[in-house]
């Protein structure tokens, strides 16, 4: 069995950057890996910040992985001929009765969470569709930065790490 890993879910915002730098400064345990899930449609400031942060993490022993499920903007605009359906984005719409509504959000799952999960499984040595054995649970600690005003986003994981 592989040794236990500590992996940061890196959004390159304030919270995950703070956690990453706390690891660099040894205020919290070392993180072996950091994973950034690129939608292809992040603000330029996020890419600039990631370009600044990545070498700091790598110089301190944290391997940074950039994963992607494609370019959300191009997929949504139909610019990718290989895409037959696009995950819905939280876009404001006008309903047939004239009321305002919000489309259901699927893009976070398909363009952020699924690529992160795929990389996490790879890091712990699981092949596609391979199941965990009970004695192999808890091979990874996943670290996420969530501020106090976002505690409603915290959930128990649906995976055994």
Summary of predicted features, one role per range:
Residues 1-161:
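ATP-dependent adenylation/nucleotidyltransferase module used to activate substrates
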